[in-house]
Amino acid sequence: MSEPIRVLQVVTYMGRGGLETMLMNYYRNIDRDKVQFDFLTHRDERWDYDDEIESLGGKIYHLPKLNPFSKNYLNALDKFFKEHKEYQIVHCHQDCLSGVVLKVATKNGVRFTIAHSH
């Protein structure tokens, strides 16, 4: 059997808000043999859904707080995508700041990007 497609979900953190709960409902009900969600968060601490994500086979990565004007943030984001070429689909839930993340993802070879404002 082939490896599942890994979709990177970009969020602030995985607390119990509406966006996070919606993503978890999708994640619980998709065929994880075909599609697997991983999460790029913008907080260091662990949140409500982290244990469940890991139990379902997802990975959680942490970056500094999203700041499009910070050279440190942009460098960390660029480094992440250079080191994680396994992602060809990035689904970003950062409202108007999704463009910052998706531009860096595209620059690093991500083929499919989705900007989703909730």
Model regions and ranges:
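Short His-centered aromatic/hydrophobic patch
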Residues: 92-98, 117
